[in-house]
């Protein structure tokens, strides 16, 4: 990495932390975790890879603040006035960072960008499905399709499902705009792979939430981490298979 690229990464990290402080998107521990994750992705990957993570974080913050008081009154809002902690940061950014670490350790064979993008797409899809879909009371179990309480783990609603599709598609388009040269497919091909992986990972998150989180085997953040890891694996596999 040239000095100019390192300088860009440092400036982006500074901007990221500044925006998070002003918007209260992350608390103190969350800021430290985001700085560590961002450094790994920016310095071992590329500044454009880091920009995708920043795009997700800003989008997630907007979705969290959307109708926040109403969600808070109903008991569906994030705690700490919407500020997310280090567990949230690691749950959504840990898998992308690990993917970049492994990609760098293996000599950068070329799958890093797609693995990162698919993983972040899962986080984006799940965040929008949760923050927007929770306002839709037409909730059914993703496993049994029975009616379940709004906000229940494993619950899905028409609005939530649509939000998950839109979220993964928006992230895929952003990834293409920022990282097109890092993909081996055409623009449409990359968008399809990333958006499908993001949406599928969101469904994996819901299934794990209903089957394992509800039974106490996993926590919310563990489920998020496994789902984003699934996305990274889909991206890795697609590089060699598709």
Residues of each region from the PLM?
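Hydrophobic alpha-helical transmembrane segments
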Residues: 1-129, 133-242
């Amino acid at each position: 990495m040239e000095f100019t690229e390192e300088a860009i990464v440092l400036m982006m990290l500074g901007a990221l932390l500044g925006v998070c402080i002003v918007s209260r998107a992350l608390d103190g521990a969350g800021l430290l975790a985001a700085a560590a994750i961002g450094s790994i992705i920016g310095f071992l990957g590329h500044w454009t890879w880091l920009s995708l993570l920043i795009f997700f974080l800003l989008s997630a913050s907007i979705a969290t603040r959307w109708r926040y008081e109403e969600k808070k009154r109903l008991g569906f809002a994030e705690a700490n006035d919407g500020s997310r902690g280090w567990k949230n940061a690691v749950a959504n950014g840990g898998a992308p960072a690990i993917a970049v670490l492994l990609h760098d350790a293996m000599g950068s064979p070329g799958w890093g960008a797609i693995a990162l993008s698919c993983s972040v797409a899962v986080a984006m899809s799940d965040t929008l499905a949760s923050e927007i879909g929770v306002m839709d009371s037409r909730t059914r179990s993703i496993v049994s399709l029975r009616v379940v309480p709004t906000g229940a783990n494993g619950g899905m609603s028409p609005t939530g499902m649509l939000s998950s599709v839109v979220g993964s598609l928006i992230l895929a388009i952003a990834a293409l705009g920022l990282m097109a040269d890092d993909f081996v497919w055409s623009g449409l091909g990359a968008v399809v792979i990333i958006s499908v992986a993001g949406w599928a990972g969101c469904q994996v998150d819901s299934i794990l939430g209903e089957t394992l989180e509800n039974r106490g085997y996993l926590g919310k953040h563990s489920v998020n981490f496994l789902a984003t890891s699934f996305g990274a694996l889909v991206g890795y596999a697609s590089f060699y298979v598709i």
